[in-house]
Amino acid sequence: MALYECVLIARQDISNAQVDTMGDEVSAILSEGGGSVSKREYWGLRTLNFRIKKNRKGHYLLLNIDAPAPAVHELDRRLRLNEDVIRHMTVKVEELEEAPSAMMQKNDRPERGGRRGDRFGDRPERGDRPDRGDRGGDRGGDRGDRAPRGERRPLREGAE
């Protein structure tokens, strides 16, 4: 039998339990065709990069499949008919990864906070900082008194 990876994106307005049921239905479809699901990962409700069928978010589900080609074709047909599935993609692979996917490893990292961290929270006191020196001069600081602008030409002829 061939090895496949399948990623589904389900509508944002269905519950986690319904997504889990959808995964069970996929397993049942494949077992009817003589295949099996070796790994199932729920990546959660994630924001889509662009709207798909009027949805801005979607439930992501990854499946590692060991099944013959006719079972995978039947799965593809049923996923196209399922209104809860926004998008799906099934790819044939050489071998299945047993380790958690990159998306799950990214979810295991601790939260880093915002882009600039916690501005006013547990920030250590910096104490007396030394003078940073002259900040003008070659950096364009105060240019002093400017010379007079002199006579200005009109922008277009006839205008004064």
From Swiss-Prot:
S-S bonds: none
Q: Which InterPro entries match?
A: Ribosomal_bS6, Ribosomal_bS6_sf, Ribosomal_S6_plastid/chlpt, Transl_elong_EF1B/ribsomal_bS6
Domain of life per record:
Bacteria
Any one of the GO CC terms: cytosolic small ribosomal subunit
Gene Ontology terms: biological process = translation
Q: Where is this region: Disordered?
A: 94-160
Keywords on record: Ribonucleoprotein, Ribosomal protein, RNA-binding, rRNA-binding
Per the record, the similarity remark reads: Belongs to the bacterial ribosomal protein bS6 family.
Q: What does this protein do?
A: Binds together with bS18 to 16S ribosomal RNA.
Q: What is this protein called?
A: Small ribosomal subunit protein bS6
Please give the organism.
Rhodospirillum rubrum (strain ATCC 11170 / ATH 1.1.1 / DSM 467 / LMG 4362 / NCIMB 8255 / S1)
Upper classification of the source organism reads:
Bacteria, Pseudomonadati, Pseudomonadota, Alphaproteobacteria, Rhodospirillales
- The UniProt gene name for this protein comes to rpsF
